[in-house]
């Protein structure tokens, strides 16, 4: 195993880990990145959304060779009951710009490319290596890691934990608590392959245009969760995720929900005739601002999913991961350049910089929303989608019924389902959590 000491060790080679390692290496630090997979991205078969602004800060010319799928020109939001959907669509030619704002990607391909940039920057990347625990001195300061390789103890001034939402290393070292089931979602995803021209016809796309569909409603059977559909070049990424605590409580299975989503009348035609080649499950942080653990300590910082950095409202994760990794690396570099120890006091600069960025500002804005949706999941993910769907059908159906009577019928349905007190209470709580 490696005997030398490093300025920094990064555990994990996802978005946050690669961003941190790349930044550290470019700053001239001696950095080692450890990844348990065969290569970066080997365990990430799913599709995802890439936010260009954050990647440009790391790799300005990424569009020249990054494995991008489609640039997004349309966003669709669906509220589903069992037989229909009520939708809000936004599509703009402004997104057919020279440098598009968002792309769909296949993580296995993209992460591998991202890792190549890390290696080009001079970092040492060691794959197929599992970090089993953190090495701490007599005072509890993290001074390195132990791996599953023989003689696998490696030392560094600071360790960057980018190990994903489970955060087992930090938990094992008593640096943080294990994430609560209500703060983590389990998402199951499939890749449905179709000819490129078929995808473009079904989604009304031209060239490399792409679309994202996000869906909520009865597909989650009253649990807190959402479904999603991403159009890639020659495949469709489709999946659904719900809180782990809801799966435990209801006994529902992720695969059962996925089949329910795929068979929905609004979804089935989009994937008809497709070939499923890949299936994966993935844990996603959903606890929001109040679930963020301790972000730094003596000799360590935590970034990305491991830090619960995910904006569930806007479905932003990869940009928060890349930004937190970059900011953590910048903070470490500043401490290093001042020749100061990697103490908790000095590494608190990382949190200060996060607070000054959009990352924690956005998460703080929606700090009360995750708990509100979880506590009221039956109403927001079951009752209201059914009521809204019936209201829309009542509105567009022409059957000779006077419009005044139709309006009364719709209002009566809402009041009978939730009462006036419940309706105003839900609206007030939702508005307060959103502001």
Curated annotation (Swiss-Prot):
InterPro entries: FAD/NAD-bd_sf, FixC-like. It comes from the Bacteria. The keyword Flavoprotein applies. Pfam families: FAD_oxidored. Keywords: FAD, Flavoprotein, Nitrogen fixation, Oxidoreductase. One of its GO terms (biological process) is nitrogen fixation. Its cofactor is FAD. GO terms for molecular function: oxidoreductase activity. Gene3D superfamilies: FAD/NAD(P)-binding domain. Could be required for the formation of a functional nitrogenase Fe protein. Probably accepts electrons from FixA/FixB and reduces a quinone. PANTHER family: ELECTRON TRANSFER FLAVOPROTEIN-QUINONE OXIDOREDUCTASE YDIS-RELATED (PTHR43624:SF2). Belongs to the ETF-QO/FixC family. This is Protein FixC.
């Amino acid at each position: 195993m490696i005997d030398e000491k490093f300025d920094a060790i990064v555990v994990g080679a996802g978005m946050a880990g690669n961003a941190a390692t790349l930044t550290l290496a470019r700053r001239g630090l001696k950095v080692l990145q450890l990844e348990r997979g065969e290569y970066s991205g080997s365990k990430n078969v799913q599709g995802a959304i890439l936010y260009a602004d954050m990647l440009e800060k790391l790799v300005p010319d990424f569009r020249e060779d990054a494995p991008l799928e489609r640039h997004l020109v349309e966003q669709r939001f669906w509220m589903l009951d069992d037989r229909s959907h009520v939708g809000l669509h936004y599509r703009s030619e402004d997104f057919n710009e020279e440098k598009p704002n968002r792309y769909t990607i296949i993580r296995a391909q993209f992460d591998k490319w991202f890792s190549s940039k890390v290696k080009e920057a001079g970092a040492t990347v060691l794959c197929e290596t599992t970090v089993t625990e953190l090495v701490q001195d007599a005072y509890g300061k993290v001074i390195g890691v132990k791996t599953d390789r023989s003689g696998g103890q490696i030392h560094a001034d600071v360790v960057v934990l980018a190990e994903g939402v489970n955060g087992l290393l930090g938990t094992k070292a008593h640096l943080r608590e294990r994430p609560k089931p209500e703060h983590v979602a389990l998402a199951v995803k499939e890749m449905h392959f179709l000819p490129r021209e078929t995808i473009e016809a079904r989604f009304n796309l031209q060239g490399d245009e792409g679309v994202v569909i996000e869906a909520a409603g009865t597909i989650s059977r009253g649990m807190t969760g959402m479904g999603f559909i991403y159009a890639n070049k020659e495949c469709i990424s489709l999946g659904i995720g719900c809180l782990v605590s809801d799966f435990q409580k209801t006994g529902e299975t992720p695969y059962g929900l996925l089949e329910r989503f795929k068979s929905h009348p609004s979804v089935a035609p989009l994937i008809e005739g497709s070939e499923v080649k890949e299936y994966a499950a993935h844990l996603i942080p959903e606890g929001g601002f109040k679930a963020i653990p301790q972000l730094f300590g003596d000799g360590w910082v935590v970034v990305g999913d491991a830090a619960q950095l995910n904006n569930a409202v806007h479905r932003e994760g990869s940009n928060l991961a890349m930004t937190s990794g970059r900011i953590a690396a910048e903070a470490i570099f500043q401490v290093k350049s001042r020749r100061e120890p990697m103490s908790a006091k000095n590494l608190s600069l990382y949190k200060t910089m996060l607070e000054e960025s959009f990352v924690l500002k956005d998460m703080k804005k929606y700090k009360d929303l995750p708990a509100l949706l979880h506590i009221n999941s039956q109403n927001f993910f079951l009752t209201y989608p059914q009521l809204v769907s019936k209201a829309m059908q009542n509105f567009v159906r022409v059957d000779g019924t006077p419009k005044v009577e139709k309006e009364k019928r719709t209002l009566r349905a809402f009041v009978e389902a939730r009462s006036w007190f419940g309706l105003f209470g839900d609206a007030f709580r939702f508005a307060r959590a959103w502001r």
